[in-house]
Amino acid sequence: MLNSVPEDDAPAPARSRMPPEERRRQLVGIGLGLLRERPLDAITVDEVARRAGISRGLLFHYFASKQAFHREVAAAGLRRLHRAMWPADERPADERLRGAIDGYLAFVERRPGRVMEMAGGSWSADPELAAILRDARATIADGLLAAADAGRDAPADGPLALLRTQSARAWLAFAEQLALDWVAEPSVEREALVDHLEASFRAATG
C-alpha cells in the first residue's frame, strides 16, 4: 500500500529509525505517491526527504543520486503494472490473456499521466531509465504471449517465434496509445475495448 502523502504545508513527520530496507521502501513509496501528481523528473529529493522526516543527506545514504532514486521509483511503478496484469491468483488458461489486458487497461485508467510519461516522456531521456522501461515492456510482451499460448502448442524458437515476440512488443506500443486515447475520449464501452485489444493481439501474434 502507498504511504499517505501529507499536504505541502503540513509539518514533516518526526524522524524515526528504520531498518535500511524498510526506509528504502518508505522513500520509494513516497516517490510513487508523488508520481500520481507530477512527472518523475519533477519529484525533488528535498520534498521526499521532508515527507519522510529525514535529512536530504540521509536520503543519499540510501540512493547514490537523484537519478538513482528516480530509477527505483520507476521500477517500482512498473512492478505495480505487472501485478495489475498478473495478480497472485492464477486464472484459468482461457482467461489469462483477457485478464492481463483488462488489468493493463485498469492501470491506465487509474494512472494515465504515468503511462503517458512512460510512452514518450522523460523516462526515455535517461538511458538507464529507458533500459528499465524497455526490459519491463519486453517482460510484459512475453507474458502476454505466454497467456495467449496457454493450453496450446506454439513455436518455442526459430524465425516464427522471433516474429511473434516482435509483434507482441509492437502491439504493446499500439495498446498503450489506444488506451490513453480511450481514457481521454471514450469511444466505446470498456468491454468492447478489451474485446478489441484481445482480438488485435491474437491477430498480430498468430
Language model regions located:
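Pre-recognition alpha-helix immediately N-terminal to the DNA-recognition helix
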Residues: R25-L34, R80, G99, G103
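Helix-turn-helix
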Residues: Q26, I30, L34-A68, E72
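Short helix-capping/turn signature of helix-turn-helix
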Residues: F63, G120-A125
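Short, hydrophobic secondary-structure boundary micro-motifs
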Residues: M116-A119, E191
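Amphipathic alpha-helical packing segments from all-alpha helical-bundle domains
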Residues: H82, F107, P127-D153, L162-A173, ...
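Hydrophobic alpha-helical connector segments
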Residues: E72, W86-G113, A154-A161, S167-W171, ...
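N-terminal intrinsically disordered/low-complexity leader segments
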Residues: M1-E22
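Amphipathic alpha-helical linker/stalk segments
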Residues: A14-R15, E37, V73-A100, L144
